[in-house]
Design a protein with these regions (language model features):
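Residue-level detector of structured alpha->beta connecting loops
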Residues: 37-38, 75, 99
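Short Gly/Pro-enriched loop/turn and capping motifs at secondary-structure junctions
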Residues: 48-49, 76, 86-92, 109-112
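Structured segments of extracytoplasmic/periplasmic soluble domains
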Residues: 32-36, 69, 73, 129-136
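Short glycine-rich, acidic/polar surface loops and turns
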Residues: 82-102
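Active-site/substrate-binding loop(s) of hydrolase catalytic cores
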Residues: 1-60, 68, 104-114
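Extracytoplasmic/secreted proteins, especially bacterial periplasmic and envelope-associated proteins
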Residues: 24, 28-31, 61-69, 85, ...
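Short, flexible loop segments at boundaries between secondary-structure elements
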Residues: 68-82
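His/Asp/Glu-rich mid-to-C-terminal helical/loop segments that flank catalytic regions of hydrolases
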Residues: 114-137
Length: 137
């Protein structure tokens, strides 16, 4: 979908590739995921202090409950993925393929790349998500 929206050539953001798994790093993440039995996935991006938790109509069991927990411990808003932001992300594929929870965590405020001065707050906001991703599911 992003390709059809005009993101058709390599760029610092929003280019999704010419085809699924066309980039070596995408293939590496895919292969790594296929070799493990992950209960959930966390994808980190840097903009907005938001947790995106579902993909289209896919809502794996407990995914909303876990998202709310992550939002509570981080202070981040919990939202559904905007339509134009879906379709090419690791989280989206993971949710659809495995029917397990996946989250995109948007850290920090401002335009990416974020300043290093935000690191301590981002870490403080997210350490509970990282621990919770291991222990609270």
């Amino acid at each position: 979908i992003k390709y059809s929206l005009g993101f058709t050539s390599p760029a610092p953001r929003d280019f999704v590739g010419t085809a699924p798994l066309s980039a070596p790093e995408s293939e590496a993440v895919f292969n790594f995921t296929m070799k493990h039995n992950f209960a959930l996935t966390l994808s980190y991006h840097s903009q907005g202090e938001i947790i995106y938790w579902k993909y289209l109509d896919f809502e794996p069991q407990k995914s909303r409950e876990i998202a709310e927990y992550f939002g509570q411990i981080s202070g981040y808003a919990v939202e559904e993925t905007p339509y134009n932001s879906g379709f090419a992300g690791y989280k989206d594929w993971f949710i659809q393929y495995y029917d397990r929870p996946g989250y995109t965590i948007e850290v920090g405020l401002g335009q990416s790349p974020l300043p290093l001065t935000q690191f301590d707050k981002i870490y403080s906001d997210n350490v509970g998500i990282l621990k919770g991703g291991i222990t609270e599911i």
